[in-house]
């Protein structure tokens, strides 16, 4: 049985877990995320803030319990990966080493770029990508 680690659980991490599960029904998949939420779609945060979606609408793939059951993954939320030993194929998350893994995917996402235009540093001006940003 193969083992997989996915670091980051945004859209890319979720789609990777789906793809792995589609090819390997029995492999162990460990997903590590610095937040304890289901993967969200960053573009939907604005719909939530203007009231066009409820909070759950930002999570188009389902709830975290639904996803972990459907894909049979072990989710390690609130455990950012702070170390990686590529040679030994191990990770450090939550203060402890995990692994080894046969394959490791780093899908930690992006950060918003705020251009240095006049007003970018005014109160209330901010990037919005995450559910926490939308709150």
Predicted regions, residues:
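FAD-binding core/adjacent interface of flavoenzyme oxidoreductases
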Residues: 1-5, 61-135
């Amino acid at each position: 049985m193969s083992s997989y680690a996915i670091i980051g659980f945004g859209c890319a991490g979720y789609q990777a877990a789906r793809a792995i599960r589609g090819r390997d029904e029995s492999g162990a998949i460990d997903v590590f995320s610095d937040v304890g939420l289901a993967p969200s779609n960053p573009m939907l945060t604005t719909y939530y803030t203007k009231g066009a979606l409820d909070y759950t609408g930002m999570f188009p793939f389902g709830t975290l319990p639904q996803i972990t059951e459907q894909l049979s993954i072990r989710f390690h939320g609130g455990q950012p990966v702070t170390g990686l030993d590529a040679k030994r194929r191990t990770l450090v998350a939550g203060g402890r080493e995990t692994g080894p893994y046969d394959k490791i995917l780093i899908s930690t996402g992006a950060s918003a770029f705020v251009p240095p235009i006049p007003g970018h540093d005014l109160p209330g001006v901010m990037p919005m990508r995450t559910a926490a940003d939308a709150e």
